[in-house]
């Protein structure tokens, strides 16, 4: 979310990313450095949908900054601004890392992120009224850049045969461009596969084309085994752009994902 915050806020705000892009946001713990950064913050921008529930509430509570408490103008969740996929499932921990309110990994969908940018501009305008025009202009510019790139991304992925993901973390991008999800390496979210489960997945995909994608914090072992079994390309990709990225950096991040999905063609 740091890239989007920079795209909308520009030089009117200093943006600090609390979680490095190569870290699993499901597994982080609150750290003193987070609390220091939050103590003087005017606004927290989170993905939401309970993705950061294991660490962000604790970090905010211990920062002793009432401005950024949930429910205050200084707390903003991207997930609250858009329609989520995978919503409405039972809150049953035996089913793995489930999110009953919806899949939180919406930031790989550039169209939803353009919608979030508009909402973020309004929140920034509320906190910093003199900058309202600038925030809205920047959000519209980001949305326009997404619109300009959509036809090229769509052409690139037309006819893409599909992908196996380690986790359901790129489904927003797949849904946006109609790329089939052929399977997930995890049998349930957050649970690594057994050898038998991996063999069954490979057997069901024999004779098909596709690509295998996984994040830096996910074990490469199972993706590489599946890659050898199916003779498919396997590629490691971060779910987030670099920590210092801005709007163009986010768009380049989507370029990399589109290129990777097209590898299966």
Segments (PLM) and residue ranges:
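Extracytoplasmic metal-acquisition and chelation regions
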Residues: 1-265
């Amino acid at each position: 979310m740091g890239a989007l915050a920079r795209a909308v806020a520009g030089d009117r705000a200093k943006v600090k990313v609390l979680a490095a892009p190569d870290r699993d946001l499901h597994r982080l713990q609150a750290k003193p450095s987070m609390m220091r950064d939050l103590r003087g913050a005017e606004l927290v921008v989170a993905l939401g949908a309970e993705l950061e529930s294991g660490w962000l509430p604790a970090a905010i509570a211990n920062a002793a900054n009432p401005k950024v408490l949930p429910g205050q103008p200084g707390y903003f969740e991207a997930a609250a601004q858009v329609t989520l996929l995978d919503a409405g499932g039972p809150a049953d921990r035996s089913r793995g890392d489930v999110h009953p309110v919806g899949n939180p990994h919406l930031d790989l969908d550039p169209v939803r992120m353009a919608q979030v940018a508009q909402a973020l501009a309004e929140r920034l305008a509320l906190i910093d009224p003199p900058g309202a025009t600038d925030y809205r202009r920047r959000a519209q510019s980001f949305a326009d850049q997404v619109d300009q790139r959509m036809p090229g991304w769509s052409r690139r992925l037309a006819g893409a045969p599909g992908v196996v993901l380690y986790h359901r973390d790129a489904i927003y991008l797949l849904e946006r461009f109609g790329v089939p999800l052929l399977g997930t390496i995890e049998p349930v979210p957050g649970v690594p596969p057994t050898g038998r489960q991996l063999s069954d997945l490979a057997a069901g995909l024999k004779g098909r084309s596709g690509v295998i994608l996984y994040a830096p914090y996910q074990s490469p072992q199972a993706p590489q085994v599946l890659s050898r079994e199916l003779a498919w390309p396997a590629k490691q990709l971060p779910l987030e752009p670099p920590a210092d990225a801005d709007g163009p950096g986010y768009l380049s991040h989507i370029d990399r994902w589109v290129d990777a999905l097209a590898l299966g063609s």
